[in-house]
Amino acid sequence: MGDLHREIMVCYDVECNKRRSKLFDALKDIGLRPIQKSVFWGDVTAAERKAIQREFIRLLDPKMDFAIVVDVHLRDASARNAFGYSAADFPPMTDHHVL
């Protein structure tokens, strides 16, 4: 993973099915992978991380919903600290090319 990308995990608890579905789609569109219900993982740039925060503001109700973004190192730790996952569940980042 290059210096421009960070490995992150996004976890959320969203009451409304419609808002939860929209957030799920938005996180997939950013390039994150769902690894559990309401948990996403992947590599993002600083701009993509800001886009996630904007989606939280746009979609979530601060009185009812919760979400967090944390830096992680699951590729390195998955074999030691995870149950039910393999290294294949956390593949290396692929290059991003400008067309």
Label each PLM-derived region with a short phrase.
Residues 2-9, 15-99:
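Basic nucleic-acid-binding interfaces
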